[in-house]
């Protein structure tokens, strides 16, 4: 009778043991795989992070967030150790923020050549893009004209050279496109003003 009981327990116990062992192995694999992916994400450079952005599906939703993303790309261009190939990719990313009208007068090759010259000049002069800020969301001006929606706001950025730190203020004009995305129509230098930041 004892032999029958042991055989029955072994028959019932073996599948339970195999199920538990399988769960432990699957859990261990999942844990190791997740940690490897987390490590890979943590080791990305700012350039890699920016270039991995999917603006077709995750476009900035407000005029301020578009301008801040533009500033983030500029800071990457002028502070990161990048190649000319990465510079071109970053310039192409910037152009995804541009209105069709601005793209028409700034085709990629022209815009890239201009950015390349400026980037090389920054490097030669040891100019550092020290930081940037944009107006508070509550300071963004919006209006409608000829059925289109427009917005404007000021972005401040500072440049550091051997001579000291200089401040630049640019007023950005944006327009909503057919997909309801705010696109940069242009920008111009403006006079220093009190910038209200968040």
Regions from the PLM with identified roles:
Residues 4, 37-41, 165-198:
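Short beta-strand edge/turn micro-motifs at domain boundaries
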Residues 109, 136, 155-159, 172, ...:
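A mature extracytoplasmic/lumenal domain signature
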Residues 1-48:
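Amphipathic, hydrophobic N-terminal targeting peptides for secretion and organelle import
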Residues 24-30, 50, 104-111, 126-132, ...:
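Short low-complexity stretches enriched in small and charged residues
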Residues 46-124:
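Core segments of small alpha/beta cavity-forming domains
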Residues 80, 161-162:
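A generic structural signal for short coil/turn motifs at secondary-structure boundaries
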Residues 113-161:
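Surface-exposed, charged secondary-structure patches
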């Amino acid at each position: 009778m004892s032999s029958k009981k042991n055989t029955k327990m072994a028959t019932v116990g073996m599948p339970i043991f195999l199920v538990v062992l399988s769960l432990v192995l699957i859990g261990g694999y999942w844990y190791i795989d997740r940690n490897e992916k987390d490590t890979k994400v943590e080791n990305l450079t700012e350039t890699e992070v920016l270039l991995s952005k999917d603006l077709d599906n995750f476009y900035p939703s407000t005029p301020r967030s578009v301008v801040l993303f533009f500033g983030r790309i500029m800071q990457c261009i002028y502070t990161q150790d990048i190649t000319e190939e990465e510079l071109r990719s970053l310039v192409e990313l910037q152009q995804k923020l541009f209105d069709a009208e601005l793209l028409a007068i700034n085709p990629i090759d022209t815009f890239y050549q201009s950015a390349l010259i400026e980037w090389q000049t920054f490097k030669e002069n040891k100019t550092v893009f020290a930081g940037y800020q944009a107006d508070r969301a509550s300071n963004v001006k919006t209006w409608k004209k000829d059925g289109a929606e427009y917005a404007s706001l000021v972005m401040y950025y500072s440049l550091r050279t051997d001579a000291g730190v200089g401040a630049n203020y640019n007023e950005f004009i944006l327009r909503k496109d057919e997909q309801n995305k705010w696109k940069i129509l242009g920008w111009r230098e403006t006079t220093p003003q009190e910038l209200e930041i968040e």
